[in-house]
Amino acid sequence: KKYLSIIFDPAFYINRNRLNLPSELLENGVIRSEINNLIINKYDLNCDIEPLSGVTAMFVANWNLLPAVAYFIGSQESRLINHSEMVISYYGGKISKQGEAAIRSGFWHLIAWKENISVGIYERINLLFNPIALEGNYTPVERNLSRLNEGMQY
């Protein structure tokens, strides 16, 4: 059920810096459905339903926490842990350049799982993040299951 919600209801989780709507609009089922269709069309999101792999199930189970997971993973790499900044960034506030770098690094670790997660989930990961935090050149990283598990358990 959560997987279907992620695929068909991106208005529920899209970062407020990507699309900031009054909550009253999302409470109306018809308007919410149209907003979801607009988001799906704007980002050309795949809506095929695929079997859940183990890694996809991990992403789905922790979906709304993936920005915090990314921050934790990136912070581990840079040896920076600042919980208050993680909370600020999660709610769409302004974060430091160092915090942005940590989020970006952690995001790269998440998308490194592209070949192991469903297309629909992969395409939607970036919608969870403040686009400013993702600016910059992509740096490929190797998949690291222990780091992913550690971030999700955190």
Predicted regions and their residues:
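General marker for long, soluble alpha-helical cores
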Residues: 1-154
